[in-house]
C-alpha cells in the first residue's frame, strides 16, 4: 500500500490532531487536481475528507479499546499507536483495514474495524476468509442493520433452546415453540388474520428486509423453511458469532 497524504482528526486538541495526522498519513488520500479549478469539486472533496476524518477517528477509538483498554486518546497514546503500527509485521494488513473503515456506512462499523485491527496488532486474530467476510459486511451494514443483528443474537441469548428465529418471533418476542403453536392454531381455525396483520406491518417488512440483507453478507444464515406464512428463518453462524463478540467489546465503553 502506498504512503498517503495526511488526514487530520477533527474535534480534537491541536497536538492530538497533529499526532494522529502522522499515523493517518498512511491512510486513504483524496486529492483531485481538478478541484483546483472547480469550486464544486473542491467543496465535494472537502466534504468527503471530513467524512473520512470522522471514520478514521472512530477507527482509532476502536483500536485504542483493544490496545489501551480505553476509548479516549491522548497525544502520547497516538504517538504510541503510530510507533506500534510502524513496527508491526502486519502493518500493511492494519492499513488495509483502516482503508475499509473509511468506506463504512456506519460509524459503529468503523470502530468495530478498529477493534479488529487491534486484535491483529496483538497477534490475536489471523485473517482468513471469514475475517474478510466480516470486514466486507461491516463496510456495508448501516446502524439499522447492526441494531437488528443485535436483536437476533439477543433473542438467542434469551431463548437458548432455539437455534433459529423467524421475523415474527423477533417482532412479537416469542419463542419458536410459541410461534409454532400460533401457526398451528391458525391452521386449525383457518384464521390467518393474526399472522397477516403482523406481516403487513411496516416494522415487520423493514426488519425482514434487513435480516435478508445480512444473510446476503453471510453474517446470518437462512435456516430451514417453516410451514407458515412467515416461512423464512434465520440462524447464527461463525462470522456472526465473531461480530457479536466485537459489539460486546465496544459496548463495554459506552
What are these language model-derived features?
Residues 1-8, 202-203, 232:
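Terminal, membrane-proximal amphipathic helices
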Residues 103, 107-254:
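Long, helix-rich, hydrophobic modules that act as membrane-proximal anchors or helical bundle/coiled-coil regulators
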Residues 6-11, 24-26, 38, 68-72, ...:
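Short, flexible coil/linker elements and helix-boundary hinge sites characteristic
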Amino acid at each position: 500500500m502506498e504512503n498517503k497524504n495526511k488526514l487530520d482528526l477533527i474535534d480534537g486538541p491541536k497536538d492530538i490532531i497533529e499526532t494522529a495526522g502522522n499515523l493517518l498519513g498512511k491512510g486513504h488520500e483524496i486529492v483531485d487536481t481538478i478541484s483546483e479549478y472547480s469550486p464544486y469539486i473542491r467543496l465535494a472533496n472537502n466534504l468527503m475528507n471530513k467524512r473520512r476524518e470522522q471514520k478514521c477517528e472512530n477507527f482509532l477509538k476502536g483500536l485504542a479499546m483493544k490496545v489501551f483498554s480505553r476509548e479516549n486518546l491522548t497525544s502520547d497514546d497516538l504517538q504510541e499507536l503510530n510507533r506500534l503500527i510502524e513496527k508491526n509485521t502486519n502493518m500493511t494488513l492494519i492499513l488495509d483495514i483502516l482503508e475499509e473503515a473509511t468506506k463504512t456506512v456506519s460509524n459503529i462499523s468503523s470502530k468495530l474495524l478498529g477493534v479488529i485491527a487491534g486484535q491483529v496488532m496483538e497477534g490475536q486474530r489471523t485473517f482468513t476468509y471469514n475475517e474478510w467476510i466480516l470486514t466486507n459486511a461491516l463496510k456495508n451494514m448501516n446502524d439499522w442493520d447492526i441494531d437488528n443483528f443485535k436483536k437476533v443474537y439477543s433473542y438467542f441469548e434469551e431463548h437458548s433452546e432455539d437455534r433459529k428465529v423467524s421475523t415474527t418471533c423477533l417482532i412479537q418476542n416469542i419463542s419458536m415453540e410459541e410461534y409454532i403453536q400460533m401457526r398451528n392454531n391458525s391452521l386449525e381455525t383457518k384464521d390467518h388474520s393474526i399472522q397477516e396483520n403482523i406481516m403487513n406491518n411496516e416494522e415487520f417488512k423493514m426488519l425482514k428486509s434487513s435480516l435478508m440483507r445480512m444473510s446476503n453478507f453471510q453474517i446470518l444464515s437462512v435456516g430451514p423453511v417453516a410451514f407458515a406464512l412467515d416461512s423464512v428463518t434465520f440462524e447464527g453462524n461463525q462470522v456472526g458469532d465473531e461480530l457479536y463478540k466485537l459489539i460486546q467489546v465496544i459496548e463495554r465503553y459506552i
